[in-house]
């Protein structure tokens, strides 16, 4: 098997998950992507999130932030479920989320791999 990190067959490394799916069992996700905030420190003219056509949903605003208590609860659930990895990204800059280091530390201590997509 190719050891390329970007292989289309990377999912084959998760044999237990594949077996459980084949047995029609409910399994936790391997990877979760979280957008902790829409707040951004740039004002890029080409950004889709600045478009008047962007559909954020009825309950969302341009500068939304997931409340810390909710994100902490989500992090606890991710660890309990045995999720392998989390990526923080968003319509904003995830590193502007003030308590992100605490959440990342909790996930790391729980054995979850963490990545962040940033504009910096």
Give names to the regions the model predicted.
Residues 2-120:
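Conserved alpha-helical substructure of the radical SAM core
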């Amino acid at each position: 098997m190719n050891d390329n990190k970007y292989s289309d067959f990377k999912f084959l490394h998760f044999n237990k998950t594949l077996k459980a799916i084949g047995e029609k069992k409910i399994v936790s996700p391997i990877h979760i992507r979280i957008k902790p905030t829409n707040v951004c420190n740039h004002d890029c003219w080409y950004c889709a999130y600045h478009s008047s056509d962007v559909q954020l949903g009825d309950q969302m605003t341009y500068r939304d932030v997931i409340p810390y208590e909710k994100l902490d609860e989500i992090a606890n659930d991710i660890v309990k479920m045995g999720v392998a990895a989390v990526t923080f990204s968003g319509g904003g800059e995830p590193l502007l989320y003030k308590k992100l280091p605490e959440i990342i530390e909790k996930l790391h201590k729980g054995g979850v791999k963490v990545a962040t997509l940033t504009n910096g």
